[in-house]
From Swiss-Prot:
It catalyses: a ubiquinone + NADH + 5 H(+)(in) = a ubiquinol + NAD(+) + 4 H(+)(out). Its EC number is 7.1.1.2. This is NADH-ubiquinone oxidoreductase chain 4. InterPro entries: NADH_UbQ_OxRdtase (IPR003918), ND/Mrp_TM (IPR001750). The keyword Mitochondrion applies. It comes from Bothrocophias hyoprora (Amazonian hognose viper). The keyword Cell wall biogenesis/degradation does not apply. One of its GO terms (biological process) is ATP synthesis coupled electron transport. Belongs to the complex I subunit 4 family.
Length: 231
């Protein structure tokens, strides 16, 4: 099932954003005020998805709702039809495609060893799988969108585009980003820190898992260094 989750979060979810980009090309660019209800709905949906993430106890559900919240920002900025907004939407879709797929991969790595996806039962893994903890930290920092990652570039462009269109949107954007940072750190601390609940022998991380995570994060870092490849 994990392969399906990775493909769904990385590719299929972004096809909706691509479809909206193509659809908006035939609509007038000067009448963006008529799309105000849809923009407010997209931003409000992103906040609600983020709040839903905070109350999740299942690791895969948390990552899935995280993908939904990011797509809310993408939809809102596509609708206003500005060059910066479109560039930010493309950047965030590509960056979050890598990030969410990597998080699903790490969730499966954890599940194969603990046989549970409940956050409170997977804690203390930094003592058992220290290298996996490093991957968890990198993936969560990218999900938070810290500089100089591509996620940060995308969210910065989205924030600039929406703020130029309507300064009030900065309140909803700021709240969404704050909650994103909260649940990302909560996910990392819940799965990696604390006293472990595992009593049996746990196998170490395999080379194929390290390779898979490297193939997720290295392209993202390379695109971050040369963003003009996609925007």
């Amino acid at each position: 099932p994990i392969a399906g989750s990775m493909v769904l979060a990385a590719i299929l979810l972004k096809l909706g954003g691509y479809g909206i980009i193509r659809m908006m090309q035939v609509l007038p660019t000067t009448k963006t005020d008529m799309f105000l209800p849809f923009i407010v709905l997209a931003l409000w949906g992103a906040i609600l998805a983020n709040l839903t993430c905070l109350q999740q106890t299942d690791l895969k559900s948390l990552i899935a709702y995280s993908s939904i919240s990011h797509m809310g920002l993408v939809v809102a900025t596509i609708i206003i039809q500005t060059p910066w907004g479109l560039s930010g939407a493309l950047a965030l879709m590509i960056a979050h495609g890598f990030t969410s797929s990597a998080l699903f991969c790490l969730a499966n790595t954890t599940y194969e060893r603990t046989h549970t996806r409940i956050l409170i039962l997977t804690r203390g893994l930094h003592n058992i799988l220290p290298m996996a903890t490093t991957w968890w930290l990198l993936a969560n920092l990218m999900n938070i969108a810290i500089p100089p990652t591509m996620n940060f570039t995308g969210e910065l462009l989205i924030t600039s585009a929406l703020f130029n269109w309507c300064p009030t949107t900065i309140i909803m954007l700021g709240l969404s980003m704050l909650i994103t940072a909260s649940y990302s750190l909560h996910m990392f601390l819940s799965t990696q820190m604390g006293q472990t609940t595992l009593n049996n022998q746990t196998e170490p991380t395999h080379s194929r898992e390290h390779l898979l995570m490297t193939l997720h994060l290295i392209p993202l870092m390379m695109i971050s260094m040369k963003p003009e490849l996609i925007i």
